[in-house]
């Protein structure tokens, strides 16, 4: 299927799981709330001792949004992570819980870039189709992780995924299926110092990568409208108003879920 997917860690209906950690993330992570999840590239992010402790029981689903009747973009949201070990009361699972929670608290703080540099999303998604949509970023352990949600019609979905993968080397990024969506995550090391000029260069670099991806996908052929969609404009406006002015918009009214991923097509 996808050569650089971490399929061994994917969630599915036959996999047992239990909630092992819950964290409250600041509102700058709420761009991911629109997708109901923050995928976590465990193999890339974990230190060796962390992998030994809980790396084998995690999945690409990462942190899932805990939905409630008042999920507002202007409020900090609760996120949960599942463990896929066979015994939630085992010594390894219990000892990993606190380490995992501390890891998650550090990880979500890397989303500050989404509020500090609101222009980044607007620039990267400008005149780009919703099928490859920049969602948000996480700065973590000196690497900038750049998240794109992938959404294509089911008739061409597999061909599009393979076309995208042909453009993305393991050093450049990864393409994979999470719980609710398909994702492309690019990795940039040049803007790890959180410098404006470096981040601006990163944004131009990202657009060039996505241009290359779009050209490859259009060979299938697939018709992609290279315009900023009205839906994306609404998401940008809602996020800006929530982060800058505290205006509440219900997440459920703006959320994005890829039915292909959710139904495991």
From Swiss-Prot:
Signal peptide: none annotated. Pfam families: Adeno_E4_34. GO terms for cellular component: host cell cytoplasm; host cell nucleus. It comes from the Viruses. Keywords: Early protein, Host cytoplasm, Host nucleus. It is found in: Host nucleus; Host cytoplasm. The keyword Oxidoreductase does not apply. InterPro entries: Adenovirus_E4_30/34. Plays a major role to prevent cellular inhibition of viral genome replication by nuclear bodies. Assembles an SCF-like E3 ubiquitin ligase complex based on the cellular proteins ELOB, ELOC, CUL5 and RBX1, in cooperation with viral E1B-55K. This viral RING-type ligase ubiquitinates cellular substrates prior to proteasomal degradation: p53/TP53, LIG4, MRE11-RAD50-NBS1 (MRN) complex, ITGA3, DAXX and BLM. Interacts with E1B-55k. Belongs to the adenoviridae E4 30 to 34 kDa protein family. This is Early E4 31 kDa protein.
């Amino acid at each position: 299927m996808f050569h650089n997917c971490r399929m061994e860690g994917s969630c599915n209906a036959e996999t047992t799981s239990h909630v092992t950690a819950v964290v409250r993330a600041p509102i700058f992570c709420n761009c991911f709330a629109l997708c109901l999840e923050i995928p976590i590239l465990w193999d890339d992010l974990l230190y060796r001792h962390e992998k030994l402790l809980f790396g084998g029981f995690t999945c690409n689903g990462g942190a899932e949004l805990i939905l409630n009747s008042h999920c507002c973009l202007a409020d900090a949201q609760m996120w949960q992570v599942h463990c896929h070990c066979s015994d939630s009361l085992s010594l390894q699972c219990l000892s990993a819980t606190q380490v995992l929670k501390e890891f998650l608290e550090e990880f979500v703080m890397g989303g500050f870039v989404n509020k500090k540099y609101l222009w980044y999303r607007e620039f990267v998604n400008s005149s780009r189709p919703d099928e490859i949509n920049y969602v948000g970023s996480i700065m973590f352990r000196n690497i900038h992780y750049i998240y794109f949600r992938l959404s294509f019609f089911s008739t061409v979905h597999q061909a599009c995924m393979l076309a995208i993968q042909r453009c993305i080397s393991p050093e450049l990024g990864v393409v994979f299926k999470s719980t609710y969506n398909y994702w492309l995550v690019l990795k940039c090391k040049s803007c790890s110092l959180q410098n404006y000029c470096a981040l601006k260069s990163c944004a131009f670099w990202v657009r060039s990568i996505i241009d290359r991806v779009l050209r490859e996908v259009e060979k299938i052929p697939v018709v992609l409208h290279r315009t900023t969609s009205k839906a994306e404009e609404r998401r940008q406006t809602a996020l800006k108003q929530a982060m800058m002015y505290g205006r509440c918009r219900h997440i459920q009214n703006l959320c994005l879920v890829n039915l292909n991923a959710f139904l495991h097509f």
